[in-house]
Amino acid sequence: MNKTDILIIGAGPVGLFTVFEAGLLGLNCTLIDNLDKPGGQCAELYPEKPIYDIPGVPFQTAQEHVDALLEQIKPFNYDLHLSERVDLIEEITLENESFWKVKTTEDKEFISKNIFIAAGAGSFEPRRPPNIEDPDKYLGKGVEYAVRSVDKYKNKNVVIFGGGDSALDWTVELSKVAKLVTLVHRRDAFRGAQHTEEQMRALVEKGKVNLLTPYLITVSYTHLTLPTIQP
């Protein structure tokens, strides 16, 4: 079993910054993450998405933020275990002291007195659209769950389905490069930041964004149909 001062579940921005804070105290850390790279959803879902609300940093992409955190923790002692999940956490006693024992899906075992859970929304699973049977079969054929390269959508017609922060943020950002962005949401009300929603609606007024609410989306390989929700 591997012994560590702090075991961190999740290697996103919070998990990485925990390594920095622990390092200042001379503590070593072990990070475990289900993804194949550090950075959490910032690296997996929207590496090129601009971030404006980091204290002291007016503008930074999500991947730049992750890269800065990785650079920040270089001086400190930590181990990174990727592409595995925590399968078991149990309390054990060793030499009359209490520890946490952690076992992963790769059958690795760790013991630590401290566990920090920095897992965000948990192991990443895309939010699949309702009423579409097996949407994964369209991946790579015009359907994606994440924007990993803005240039891919340059001068393209883009349809975004969703009503939260990511949908609103990418509607605003992709409108700068896409031929036309259509935002589809199954409700009239949005769940994202008010400021971003106002930006989106301003783009609708300018004709740069086509807004369809309340709509559901159905997909086939050759066409899209957007039937309205009946009250």
Each model region followed by its residue ranges:
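FAD-binding core/adjacent interface of flavoenzyme oxidoreductases
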Residues: 1-9, 24-25, 37, 80-156
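Rossmann-like dinucleotide/flavin-binding elements
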Residues: 2-3, 7-36, 139-193
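Glycine-rich nucleotide phosphate-binding loop and flanking beta-alpha elements
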Residues: 15, 123-125, 167, 219
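Short amphipathic alpha-helical segments
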Residues: 19-21, 43-44, 127-131, 171-173, ...
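Conserved N-terminal glycine-rich FAD pyrophosphate-binding loop of Rossmann-like flavoproteins
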Residues: 36-59, 196-197
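Short beta-strand to alpha-helix junction loop
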Residues: 54-71, 187-197
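A Rossmann-like FAD-binding core segment of flavoenzymes
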Residues: 73-104, 109-112, 176-224
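Single conserved hydrophobic/aromatic residue that forms the stacking wall/gate
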Residues: 223-231
